[in-house]
């Protein structure tokens, strides 16, 4: 890619002759090298899961979180550079607080997504800035029900039934398309997301990983929370069993 973009990849404000902005493509590459992040919208809420690759065996479990609460009713899962992700999470929290202080009500998920996407896009407009090397999945529950958005390094934001980013995104999207999300509960969704992440993890090539999951549903009183430990362990067991059965076949 660098040889193709030589001369046109020095600034985020420079277009190549065929209309590409290489700095944004490089930022997207940082996302594609990250662990897989999956988000699905079930009939009663949102489930998000992250394949959090463990950089060192000396790291304590739970370190370097990839899923963050940005408001009582909204959470964000990050793929790509963790430090860049923290900046986007901080901005999302700030926007949620600002909206609530002005209007006296929780920020709608669509409004929050648009504000964060505008901030991400801002970093693609000026030569002294660089694009964020991360993508995020934003899930929330508001008066319109559960909603799921994905924001890319270019600053675009779309609403999804199911979304995936990271190195296994294409295979994850294929698996998500097989699910009947409109009839699936969040409890069932937790198990399905765990199965997808375990299935896509390549033990021969990838580092060990920790499964991080959260949800927003009736079970959590429509608040963004970590998936309870007992359900998370059940999901891990189901995922490993499904993987063993697949290998046996």
Swiss-Prot record:
Subcellular location, record wording: Cytoplasm; Nucleus
Induction info: Induced by the endoparasitic nematode M.incognita. Levels increase after infection in both giants cells and endodermal cells of galls. Later confined to giant cells at high levels.
GO terms classed as biological process: ubiquitin-dependent protein catabolic process
Phenotypic consequence of gene deletion: Lethal due to defect in male gametogenesis.
Covalent link (Glycyl lysine isopeptide (Lys-Gly) (interchain with G-Cter in ubiquitin)) residue numbers: 221
Lineage, opening ranks: Eukaryota, Viridiplantae, Streptophyta, Embryophyta, Tracheophyta
Entry comment describing in which tissues the protein is expressed: Ubiquitous low levels.
Residues annotated with O-acetylserine modification: 214, 220
Residues bearing PTM N-acetylserine: 2
InterPro entries: Ntn_hydrolases_N, Proteasome_alpha, Proteasome_alpha-type, Proteasome_asu_N, Proteasome_sua/b
Residue ranges of the TM segments: none
Entry protein name: Proteasome subunit alpha type-3
Protein family: Belongs to the peptidase T1A family.
Record keywords: Acetylation, Cytoplasm, Isopeptide bond, Nucleus, Proteasome, Ubl conjugation
Cellular component, GO annotation: apoplast; cytosol; nucleus; peroxisome; plant-type vacuole; proteasome complex; proteasome core complex, alpha-subunit complex; vacuole
Subunit structure as annotated in this protein's UniProt entry: Component of the 20S core complex of the 26S proteasome. The 26S proteasome is composed of a core protease (CP), known as the 20S proteasome, capped at one or both ends by the 19S regulatory particle (RP/PA700). The 20S proteasome core is composed of 28 subunits that are arranged in four stacked rings, resulting in a barrel-shaped structure. The two end rings are each formed by seven alpha subunits, and the two central rings are each formed by seven beta subunits. The catalytic chamber with the active sites is on the inside of the barrel.
Purpose of the protein: The proteasome is a multicatalytic proteinase complex which is characterized by its ability to cleave peptides with Arg, Phe, Tyr, Leu, and Glu adjacent to the leaving group at neutral or slightly basic pH. The proteasome has an ATP-dependent proteolytic activity.
């Amino acid at each position: 890619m660098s040889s193709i973009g030589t001369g046109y990849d020095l600034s985020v404000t420079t277009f190549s002759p065929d209309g590409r902005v290489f700095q944004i493509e490089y930022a997207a590459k940082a996302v594609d090298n990250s662990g897989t992040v999956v988000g699905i919208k079930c009939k009663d809420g949102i489930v998000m899961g992250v394949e959090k690759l463990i950089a060192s065996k000396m790291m304590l479990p739970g370190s370097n979180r990839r899923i963050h609460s940005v408001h009582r009713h909204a959470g964000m899962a990050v793929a790509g550079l963790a430090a860049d992700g923290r900046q986007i999470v901080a901005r999302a929290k700030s926007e949620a607080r600002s909206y609530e202080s002005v209007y006296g009500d929780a920020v709608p998920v669509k409004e929050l997504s648009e504000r964060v996407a505008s901030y991400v896009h801002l970093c693609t407009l000026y030569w002294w800035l660089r694009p964020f090397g991360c993508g995020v999945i934003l899930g929330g529950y508001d008066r319109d029900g559960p909603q799921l958005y994905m924001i890319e390094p270019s600053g675009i934001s779309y609403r999804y039934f199911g979304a995936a980013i990271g190195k296994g995104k294409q295979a994850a999207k294929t698996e998500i398309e097989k699910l009947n999300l409109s009839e699936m509960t969040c409890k069932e969704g937790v198990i399905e997301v765990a199965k997808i992440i375990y299935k896509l993890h390549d033990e021969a090539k990838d580092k060990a990983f920790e499964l991080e999951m959260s949800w927003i549903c009736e079970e959590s009183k429509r608040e963004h929370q970590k998936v309870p430990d007992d359900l998370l362990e059940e999901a891990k067991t189901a995922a490993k069993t499904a993987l063993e059965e697949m290998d046996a076949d």
